[in-house]
Amino acid sequence: PAPYKGGNPNNVLIIGDTHEPFCKEGYLEFCRDVQEQYDCGTVIHIGDTVDNHAISYHEKDVKGMSAGDEWNMAKAKMKRWYNTFPNVKVCIGNHDALPFRKVFTAGLPVEWLKSYQELLESPRTWEWDFVHQVNGVIYQHGTGMSGEMAAVNAARENRQSTVIGHLHTVCNTRFLASYKDLIFGLTVGCGIDHKAYAF
């Protein structure tokens, strides 16, 4: 789909974990439709843009793709996201960070790796960072968090409203209120194809 022109920068489209090349068919089009429906001028990818299943620390499917084949397919699929959403703030997720973790495990200097932008051939208008703030709300992937209360616990720790992804089976909003403020923790859904061998 063609990029959405315009949009209110105060309206934020959150793209859930895509885990390319294992994203659910039609998820990109769904996100683009939501962007237009709600006039979203700010786009945030909550992280785990790619899966990196072949280099995961978890057990792998021996009949799955090689690391090179998976990487090339993931990069090809990510180009569709770049074309549809040219300006994105990306929260680096645990799967995005796997190449850096593997370099650390091997005892190699992290400087030997390229940046996320270079690795995934993303446009310069995709801003890669672990945390982004938009209108007083923190957006982070949620690495290391778990359970129904993960996002509201993150909001409590951050002392401000917080949005996370990471938890494929949780999608909720919880609130914390005091005499001084009201903050929320939001866990967004994800765009994975749960039938793919990687899951």
What are these model-derived regions, one by one?
Residues 7-9, 39, 84, 135, ...:
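Residue-level preference for short coil/turn positions at secondary-structure junctions
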Residues 87-96, 129-138, 171-172:
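Short secondary-structure transition/capping segments
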Residues 11, 15-122:
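Core catalytic region of metal-dependent phosphoesterases/phosphodiesterases
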Residues 13, 89, 123-128, 140, ...:
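General small-molecule cofactor/ligand-binding pocket signal
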Residues 3-13, 132-138:
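Beta-strand-turn-beta hairpins that frame and shape the catalytic cleft
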Residues 4, 35, 154-155:
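Structural motif
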Residues 117-134:
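Short acidic low-complexity segments
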